[in-house]
Amino acid sequence: NKSRKRRNRESLLGAATVEPPKPIPLTWKTEKPVWVNQWPLPKQKLEALHLLANEQLEKGHIEPSFSPWNSPVFVIQKKSGKWRMLTDLRAVNAVIQPMGPLQPGLPSPAMIPKDWPLIIIDLKDCFFTIPLAEQDCEKFAFTIPAINNKEPATRFQWKVLPQGMLNSPTICQTFVGRALQPVREKFSDCYIIHCIDDILCAAETKDKLIDCYTFLQAEVANAGLAIASDKIQTSTPFHYLGMQIENRKIKPQKIEIRKDTLKTLNDFQKLLGDINWIRPTLGIPTYAMSNLFSILRGDSDLNSKRMLTPEATKEIKLVEEKIQSAQINRIDPLAPLQLLIFATAHSPTGIIIQNTDLVEWSFLPHSTVKTFTLYLDQIATLIGQTRLRIIKLCGNDPDKIVVPLTKEQVRQAFINSGAWKIGLANFVGIIDNHYPKTKIFQFLKLTTWILPKITRREPLENALTVFTDGSSNGKAAYTGPKERVIKTPYQSAQRAELVAVITVLQDFDQPINIISDSAYVVQATRDVETALIKYSMDDQLNQLFNLLQQTVRKRNFPFYITHIRAHTNLPGPLTKANEQADLLVSSALIKAQELHALTHVNAAGLKNKFDVTWKQAKDIVQHCTQCQVLHLPTQEAGVNPRGLCPNALWQMDVTHVPSFGRLSYVHVTVDTYSHFIWATCQTGESTSHVKKHLLSCFAVMGVPEKIKTDNGPGYCSKAFQKFLSQWKISHTTGIPYNSQGQAIVERTNRTLKTQLVKQKEGGDSKECTTPQMQLNLALYTLNFLNIYRNQTTTSAEQHLTGKKNSPHEGKLIWWKDNKNKTWEIGKVITWGRGFACVSPGENQLPVWIPTRHLKFYNEPIRDAKKSTSAETETSQSSTVDSQDEQNGDVRRTDEVAIHQEGRAANLGTTKEADAVSYKISREHKGDTNPREYAACSLDDCINGGKSPYACRSSCS
């Protein structure tokens, strides 16, 4: 029978007519020739290349060429000593349209039915038996150079699939697949695997296998393909696709991992790629390779250095041991497959089994996409992934899925977990939790953190409620039964809040409800108990998340955490308690520093806007390098008429800011009552520019009753006078060539320029690029933020409300009439810096008086020129002192004490008191300079006779 079958096979082969296969043309991105010069070759390699080229020429694989295309060619020597010719086709591949793979993945030999006989064959020189399309041959030309160019180079082009061409594997699979299609149709009950040029045939009986193989030989030969006779396998053990196949078992082929070559990222990437390829056979869980996977972190440069750690060395040893001992099983085609899910450490592990026979392992990637992945979601993802794998292997869903959950937990998972619904969508099999009794799974390291045990999804009854908060200043805090503020090194509000939650979990060893205004922290705390934490390049974040997970898992009592929106106006105790926690970490000082860095607002403005002390506000200004250098000197006291209400009297001038370029003419207007400033940058200072500026002022400040300017031509022209008359505005000018008449606006010019310099050289704002934008920022600071001495509101508030809120307004005072040299009683209308406006009486015009010619009126008054008593004067002094302190005046306490001691001597005249005060001051100071320490000579001095620095000179 055997001889008869052999003769039948031979006759069948002899009768077959070989038809040349039809070539598959390539698609090109360009028809422009690609030419890469051939590099010189050593004499030995050049001789070998000539021999190989002649051999391929005789076989008809190449032909002479005059193609404008060229690719370099070279040879390598095999271990056997034979030479192999290769072509560098990288440049040509770049202009070929890819066909795409026909087999995205290797077939699994575990699907070969157990106990079926096998035959494995290898096609000989498969690429060289498949022709190229005629129009494509010239694209694969190469050149064999001559030494010293002593003769013309020899050029050839490929007529068959060249090795290294982008689409050669796809074309090869297509040709072999066509040849095997008749075999698959005729022997549909046989199991045939084809991968590139390796073919495996399995049949239920040997006779059927021989018949199938005989027919396969004929079809392969008919397609112009040849079987390598020395690579036919007919007995166990079979070697196929890196596996050793036996009648029932499948083992990985024995390999040795070379550790001495592992030096770069590329080396470790290749190693782990190979290990991952055989992991479904080896059964190495993800947690057992975590140190090897960790080596891949860091620099993405393939040549970046990497080092094999002792922990990773142990894991490689485990891989080698598994290669020696691991095995899987061939399946029974009539029995269903099952999926087992084990709750292993790090991430779950899946196993495909048939009865108790292991078919394949399934794992999740070591790194996840999300920062936190719940363990239940990982189980669902693994189920969905392995279901697709089983369908790919055998075309069917698993018959049963075994999970480490109770029936109630499975029911809750279907209700609450979206990932669970996706992973088990359309599954009609059995979901069970009873594992088969076998020892092959006992080595797995299991975890108990599958579902939350400590974290609750609903508020706890009869539990403490704690509110947490964190700030970007590094402070974390909680409030509840007790309050605590924690200083952290973090500059992130979320990280500080994370520290606050961790501290609460550590401090309260009892059931608690935590309320946080960070949704990010709340979600992280809810998930962290059973989550796989994704590795981050930020070590601080890794440490915080790991500490949070450890803290939660160590707790003995449950907790609930929820989110509350911060800074809302909602009523109720929760909002108030959250605000209390926010107050513990919010820093008005930091906000004040940030505003000053942006606008360079003065100390009074900072104190008014933020809850900071005078010292803190002054420290901010004093520590600012720009404000320290550009601090304006104290202006000498004097009188310049001012308005008694907003828009009563303006002063206007033009100053120059060279840095503004062609817009360097800055027109400035200041309201003399509120000190509200408005300025515009113009290209000149003519009447048209002045009118343009005033219209801008009207839009912001309103229309004034009176404007005072200098005698510039733009202000004295008839056109300007006509413009003012249209708006019903009266106009006055100062003394020509005397700037003192315009002292207020001149001072404003200096203030505005100084503010511009501060913000330009020391400001944090980078968006103020145009001159007008720079002006607007300076004006905003001066009008809406700064508060000046003797005032309690900003210039903008004074201008809009008409209220200055000076503490001396409405008070009775004595004022000195310099014409008559007498002291009169009046009432303060407004009080400014070094000046005051006094009402002498009914039906009399107000009088502007320097503050050195004023004193407070106190009842009873015996003599307007003499002090009433030491007690009265002391009371007056304390009143003024209190006001000075409010205005930020820094007094020398020792001098104050000296002058008070002199006043309290109860002498008959002020001169005698001054003499005593002067004497004490000299003795105390050890200084003989009478001008510096002499007390004020005016009885009832407005400064209490004790502040020569404020008086500057004798009040009389």
UniProtKB/Swiss-Prot annotation:
Matches recorded under InterPro entries: DNA/RNA_pol_sf, Integrase-like_N, Integrase_C_dom_sf_retrovir, Integrase_C_retrovir, Integrase_cat-core, Integrase_Zn-bd_dom_N, Rev_trsase/Diguanyl_cyclase, RNaseH-like_sf
UniProt entry keywords in alphabetical sequence: DNA integration, DNA recombination, DNA-binding, Endonuclease, ERV, Hydrolase, Metal-binding, Multifunctional enzyme, Nuclease, Nucleotidyltransferase, RNA-directed DNA polymerase, Transferase, Transposable element, Zinc, Zinc-finger
Zn finger limits (Integrase-type): 587-628
Annotated region (Disordered), positions in chain: 865-890
Cross-referenced Pfam families: IN_DBD_C, Integrase_Zn, RNase_H, rve, RVT_1, RVT_thumb
Positions that bind Mg(2+) 1: D469, E497, D517
Tree of life domain: Eukaryota
Reactions listed under catalytic activity: DNA(n) + a 2'-deoxyribonucleoside 5'-triphosphate = DNA(n+1) + diphosphate; Endonucleolytic cleavage to 5'-phosphomonoester
Amino acids binding Mg(2+) 2: D469, D582
UniProt free text on domains: The LPQG and YXDD motifs are catalytically important and conserved among many retroviruses.
Function: Early post-infection, the reverse transcriptase converts the viral RNA genome into double-stranded viral DNA. The RNase H domain of the reverse transcriptase performs two functions. It degrades the RNA template and specifically removes the RNA primer from the RNA/DNA hybrid. Following nuclear import, the integrase catalyzes the insertion of the linear, double-stranded viral DNA into the host cell chromosome. Endogenous Pol proteins may have kept, lost or modified their original function during evolution.
The protein, known as: Endogenous retrovirus group K member 6 Pol protein
Taxonomic lineage from the root: Eukaryota, Metazoa, Chordata, Craniata, Vertebrata
Gene name for this UniProt entry: ERVK-6
